[in-house]
């Protein structure tokens, strides 16, 4: 299964790219994590933030590969323990379909993105900077996979 992390924003700080790559590169081909960056719309002083969110949301939806399961990351979504996420990952891997994870920009996800999702997932009730979400997601996917495979990375 390929996991497509579709995220708004390009040109992340070096530490974000390094941390994301650290975990993404640990995953095997059976559960590969690939980043698709969606260019953020420029925000000016009097920017129409609703229009910007709609534009970015439409670009995200266009980037979803055909026949993917779609999981939208949103603070109002469902939260999972590590064990629950590991079971979900196992189900997704056995579905025979790829997975798309949607991470919005500063304005969050649009209603259309949430409606397209098969699941809306909340990493935490806290608000995280969007670049950091990439790192957290990569680490949590790796942790869930390592738990499935009995790898010593995750400890109860």
From Swiss-Prot:
Its main location: cytoplasm. One of its GO terms (molecular function) is rRNA (pseudouridine-N3-)-methyltransferase activity. Transmembrane segments: none annotated. It is found in: Cytoplasm. It catalyses: pseudouridine(1915) in 23S rRNA + S-adenosyl-L-methionine = N(3)-methylpseudouridine(1915) in 23S rRNA + S-adenosyl-L-homocysteine + H(+). It is an enzyme of class 2 (transferase). It holds the Pfam family SPOUT_MTase. SUPFAM superfamilies: alpha/beta knot. S-adenosyl-L-methionine binds at residues 73, 104, 123-128. GO terms for cellular component: cytoplasm. Keywords: Cytoplasm, Methyltransferase, rRNA processing, S-adenosyl-L-methionine, Transferase. Its EC number is 2.1.1.177. Belongs to the RNA methyltransferase RlmH family. Specifically methylates the pseudouridine at position 1915 (m3Psi1915) in 23S rRNA. Homodimer. NCBIfam families: PRK00103.1-4, tRNA_RlmH_YbeA. This is Ribosomal RNA large subunit methyltransferase H. The lineage of its organism: Bacteria, Pseudomonadati, Pseudomonadota, Gammaproteobacteria, Chromatiales.
